[in-house]
Amino acid sequence: MMRPADKVGVALLSDEEIPTCFQVLSKSFGHDAPFVDMYFPDHDTSSGQAQGSKRLTVWKQTAKNSTFLKAVTQAGQGDQEHIIGVAIWTYMKEPPPAELDKVENVEEVWPDEDDLEFMTRLWRDYVIPRTQAIKDSYGKGIYVLELLAVHPGYQRLGAGTALVKWGTKAADERGLKAVVEGTPVARRLYEQCGLRAEIEEMRFDVGEEFIGRRKPKLIYMTREPKF
């Protein structure tokens, strides 16, 4: 745990640090976020973490408009740095593909046909609000917080706030709207950083055959740029 003298900072994430950050992601969400559970299958197992880390590494290496950040704590000179949080901010000028198989190796990640179909339908609805925001930007684009996770042992210490404000500052500098599909648990944090709910509960039409599965509870939140 942190000591009173510890400070939280934000820095760019290296490829080598992605496995550590994926463990933070898994511990942060546990099994309380259905979208995370489906998007990163078995994320709390060694095989799931290996696969998730591999996917994040490919994302980081191929998406030039995505910035991977870490929140770190370091008590003083010579003390070991601890990664306690992770965030991914993306400058998005083109609408994301509505078809999951255009952004993921779907057969490898979701070998079960029902899981794949369920995730495909979730994804199709998930990208609708940000797609509309991009269309409404008249070519400027938006700044999207695609992932935010803070280790449960280091929450309420400012890591989440620092990671969010890094992106809202970058959005302001570009004159762009910032958006996030946030969980209800994180709502207060986002509101403290200036984001406001535009859609109180995002809609996921997954069909009658998946009525027994947990659907995500996500709030679509936005923040206008401050000049």
Residue ranges and their predicted role:
Residues 79-149, 155, 202-216, 227:
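Conserved acyl-donor/pantetheine-binding loop and adjacent beta-alpha core of acyl/acetyltransferases
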Residues 145, 178-182:
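Conserved hydrophobic beta-strand within the GNAT/NAT acetyltransferase core sheet
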Residues 150, 156-169, 192:
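Conserved acetyl-CoA-binding loop-helix of GNAT-fold acetyltransferases
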Residues 161, 173-175, 184-204:
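Conserved active-site alpha-helix within GNAT-family acetyltransferase domains
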Residues 9-23:
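A short beta-loop-alpha structural element at the N-terminal edge
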